Amino acid sequence: MRFFSYLGLLLAGLTSLQGFSTDNLLEEELRYWCQYVKNCRFCWTCQDGLCKNKVLKDMSSVQEHSYPMEHCMIHRQCKYIRDGPIFQVECTMQTSDATHLINA
């Protein structure tokens, strides 16, 4: 029975990780990534065909389909730590592990 409670905790942790989306990055992560990969779609907010960079405020607006915006994904390296009956997840952001998915 104890095995199933551990399994439930582990699955709950995995479920919370699946909820991560680059559409809603934390502000400090958004600042970091958008300094280096300015063409990632998550760095831009678009309305009525005009897009403004969320981080680089001095950058001028661009037309939505005239700037090469790509769908990007950020990958993290995670490890699971068991502390008695509780599992914790620790993730580190890897700077060199941003994958661009062109035309996704």
Curated annotation (Swiss-Prot):
Keyword Signal tagged: yes
UniProt-listed InterPro entries: ASFV_fam_110
Signal peptide: 1-31
Pfam families in UniProt: v110
Ion transport in keyword set: no
Paired cysteines (S-S): none
Domain of life: Viruses
Protein keywords: Early protein, Signal
Induction of its expression: Expressed in the early phase of the viral replicative cycle.
Biological role: Plays a role in virus cell tropism, and may be required for efficient virus replication in macrophages.
Family: Belongs to the asfivirus MGF 110 family.
Protein name: Protein MGF 110-2L
Organism field: African swine fever virus (strain Badajoz 1971 Vero-adapted)
Phylogenetic placement of the source organism: Viruses, Varidnaviria, Bamfordvirae, Nucleocytoviricota, Pokkesviricetes
